[in-house]
Design a protein with these regions (language model features):
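Terminal peptide-recognition signature
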Residues: 1, 28, 40, 75, ...
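Adenosine-nucleotide cofactor-binding segment
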Residues: 1-36
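Short beta->alpha linker loops
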Residues: 12-15, 31-32, 56, 80-84, ...
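A general structural signal for well-ordered alpha-helical segments in protein cores
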Residues: 25, 37, 65, 86-90, ...
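Short glycine/proline-centered loop/turn elements that form peptide/ligand docking sites
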Residues: 34-38, 58-59
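Conserved helix-to-beta-strand junction in the class I
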Residues: 42-44
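Rossmann-fold dehydrogenase core element
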Residues: 46-53, 62-104
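C-terminal hydrophobic helical "lid"/dimerization subdomain
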Residues: 83-136
Length: 136
């Protein structure tokens, strides 16, 4: 993650408010959610944004609505983008300007091992399955 440009990494099991302080960031991008979700809102500055595109730690979260309206936060789900966004993304990848972070690669026949790794949730990046040439 540091190689991708992060200036600091906080373990998802740590309290971000303790690590960063309250009202420390403008935007939180979260793919985890789960029980520690309210702690993420604590670090967002007034008028800030929270963006999610996943919930691997659990989709049900607790929200104190006062945090939402008193801090004037914007909560956003992100699973769909305009076609031009995807086209631009592909262009960046082809130009090697964006490099996906790959945690592990498994042949399709080892999908069970890939699933075991996914369920452990102790990796950074994507788990890739490769398809045999005779199946393409």
């Amino acid at each position: 993650v540091m190689a991708a440009g992060a200036s600091r990494i906080i373990d998802r099991n740590d309290n971000p408010a303790e690590a960063l302080g309250a009202n420390a960031v403008d935007v939180v991008v979260d793919l985890v959610a789960g029980p520690s979700w309210p702690n993420l809102l604590d670090v967002i500055k007034r008028g800030g944004r929270y963006v999610t595109a996943g919930a691997i730690a659990g989709p049900i979260v607790e929200l104190d609505l006062r945090t939402l309206y008193l801090k004037d936060l914007t909560l956003m789900g992100s699973t769909y983008q305009d076609k031009i966004c995807f086209k631009n993304l592909i262009t960046y990848i082809e130009k090697d300007e964006i490099k996906p972070i790959v945690a592990a690669t498994f042949p399709l026949k080892e999908i069970g091992k890939a699933q075991e790794m996914f369920l452990k949730k102790n990796f950074v990046g994507k788990i890739v399955l490769t398809i045999p040439n005779d199946m393409v």
